[in-house]
Amino acid sequence: MRAGVRIGIDPGDARIGVARSDPSGFLATPVETVRRGKGDLARIGRILAAEEDEGATVLEVVVGLPRSLSGREGPAAAKVREFAGRLAARVAPVPVRLVDERMTTVSAEAMLRDQGRTGGKRRAVVDQAAAVLILQHALDTERATGAAPGEIVEET
């Protein structure tokens, strides 16, 4: 397992969930929800800079790529690919990777519902919870296979 903090991103149309791993790459935890739109990439860049200011090495950013249950990519995936390309340009030289995020928002909603969070309380953190699930899956995959997860994103 490669050492270093990873940042997990769940990009939605209105909000972006952000999570981080510990430096050993064992556990993903929520960071914040960023409002989608003007300044969103700058905010994510500041999150990475804050990690580095605290002495962490940010190894990579992992972005969830929505696919259908059959594995096909639709319009939402195209939007995420475009976002990830812009993010890669913003955070370079830190690499950005796309990983399969099938069902993470549904799983995050169910998890929060099971914890008794309802309505606005759930909406406020569901994107962070989805980012945690995306990042944790990437960490677990790397630990199991020994290979970096997903596909690398080229800057746009």
Swiss-Prot record:
GO biological process: rRNA 5'-end processing
Enzyme class: hydrolase
Record GO cellular component, one term: cytosol
Keywords: Cytoplasm, Hydrolase, Nuclease, Ribosome biogenesis
Matching SMART domains: YqgFc
Domain of life: Bacteria
EC numbers on record: 3.1.-.-
InterPro entries the UniProt entry points to: RNaseH-like_sf, YqgF, YqgF/RNaseH-like_dom, YqgF/RNaseH-like_dom_sf
Compartments where located: Cytoplasm
GO function terms (MF aspect): nuclease activity
Protein family membership: Belongs to the YqgF nuclease family.
Stated role: Could be a nuclease involved in processing of the 5'-end of pre-16S rRNA.
The name this protein goes by in its record: Putative pre-16S rRNA nuclease
